[in-house]
């Protein structure tokens, strides 16, 4: 912002008129891009219900704070051309910078703590910390702003009003000191989280290491953005304290610090496939009116509620998973039909959905459901279902009812498989949606899906599944033959 006049501003900053004009233009560009980025994130969170969870609440508060700060700053930059030290506009500008920046930093720290709490500590109720977050993120900046206003240290400092160049102690005590402390704590929390997930990755037998490295990057990219956007601000203030005012450092300070909201928004969008598919499908709509990107827009539109990674077309992994899933369903149906022919003679058989067991036991999501205290993996469900059915095996009436239900379920499974095959044929561009509760945190918000090794260490997942089904067949046949022998002896 141009304050007082060009000559006095240049004298205060040590920059020429051309350098000061360039800094002013950079400031406006940074303000507008930050406003656009935060608005897009808030729009996406408002429109996409799958993104409404504890983590995205924190991101929403960060973007809301940054948006309010940038809006007020932009208005003051555009309308207040001639300010003087001690004016209301000058004090307002300084307060907006101090309060808004500190609040954004603290929300970033809360985001780091929440991710650590969810992944490492497996906190079942992360929402209980939100009230403390609000007190922490709103009260601390307020205290710092009140101290700044009460000390009379606000002056015109170039493109904005803030703590004067001669008050280096107040600058670092009220602003850059807390910044360094917040960044250090956030980096420690992210480091502990990354170390934990890295150990899980190393202990797995998954070959998909590249994808896991992508998840690792998503855990730390927002803290990298946090550092890069403010590192030149720290450098510039240290240099200013030495009575030096290099123009290029000041311009980088202006652009990056004001653009923190924009780059943080880009990071949040990148970490959420749901978000960028939704936004990309909207952005491409005008181009489709002229015949451009029609197929791409249609694919993004179909997959905008899909939390998988590849937005355009069906990836090879997705195709293999679809083929494997359909093969398992067909195998299970044949297996269930064979079981139903012997249910009257064999009451000890337990009907299980092997494909669900395989899917749930091989993939674990580090997500905490809103209504459940702990996430239960597929293997636990498998055991619980088996135990509950074993408890009912001694009742003849329940056996007859179970046989009828099994027959109906098999018919439904056959119909569902036919429908699935038709859907896969007709919707080749739609990727399979992850098998997760919609109330749980989307995996790509915090990038923490870790594959669990197969139950048998020497078999592939496909062989493990076949072994499960073959063992069930053998157990059923052996039991059936033993029952026949008992009947013949009688």
From Swiss-Prot:
Q: Which GO terms describe its molecular function?
A: adenylate cyclase activator activity; cAMP binding; cAMP receptor activity; G protein-coupled receptor activity; GTPase activator activity
Where does the UniProt entry say this protein principally localizes? Answer: membrane
**Which residue ranges are recorded for the region named Disordered?**
303-353, 373-437
Which stretches does UniProt call biased (Low complexity)? 329-346, 397-427
Q: How is it modified after translation?
A: C-terminal Ser or Thr residues may be phosphorylated.
- TM spans, by residue? 24-43, 58-78, 95-120, 132-150, 174-192, 217-235, 247-271
Alphabetized Gene3D superfamilies for the sequence: Rhodopsin 7-helix transmembrane proteins
Ribosomal protein recorded as keyword: no
- Single GO cellular component term: plasma membrane
A biological process (GO) annotation for this entry? cGMP-mediated signaling
Q: How does it sit in the membrane?
A: Multi-pass membrane protein
Report residues carrying sugar chains: 5, 85
**Record PTM Phosphoserine, positions in chain:** 204
- Tell me the function of this protein: Receptor for cAMP. Coordinates the aggregation of individual cells into a multicellular organism and regulates the expression of a large number of developmentally regulated genes. The activity of this receptor is mediated by G proteins.
Which protein family is it in?
Answer: Belongs to the G-protein coupled receptor 5 family.
* Name recorded for this polypeptide: Cyclic AMP receptor 3
